[in-house]
Amino acid sequence: DSWNHFFNNYGMNQIDLDVFSFLLNKGINNKQNLDTETNKLRVNVHQKVLQRNHEVRNSEATVKTRGKYQRIFREDIVLPNYDYQCAVTGIKTLSLLRAAHIVRWADNEKERLNPQNGICLSVLADACFEKGFITIDSDYKVRVSDQAEKDPALYDEISKYDGVKINLPKIKENRPAKRFLLE
């Protein structure tokens, strides 16, 4: 609210990236020094998402930037969409949450930043999803694979979610695309 008042009061509708970075770093008390390169990438990602251009070409996703793209996808897109909780388990401990790609990063350049290709999962749910022990059907219900029964402890942990509808983002446009879930 104070930022809104500041910008409206002084008629500002644009801000230089360096000034934005300075203010952002001041606002977070320099707990995390955000470099200009990361901020430029963050702005670029948000512009791409708004334009529905979710592509990150392999030539863009160098070893140096891939992690930054994925961090922005996690912190700015997926976790906020799911109110910072696992869509399957409801776990809210931030350090245990992952931004899972439904269609893997390596498999589709065009959908890497697509909010509909991301789902917030806990560490265990993410590993189970990645290995196929759990899937999410087109009705957004968790399905536990028969393979999970081979490990009674694992099956005991995840079977309680079988048939349960996942927690979905409030904004319908950010919910998992059924076409991705069916791949």
Language model: regions and residue ranges:
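A detector for short metal-coordination/catalytic motifs
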Residues: 58, 62-63, 68-73, 81, ...
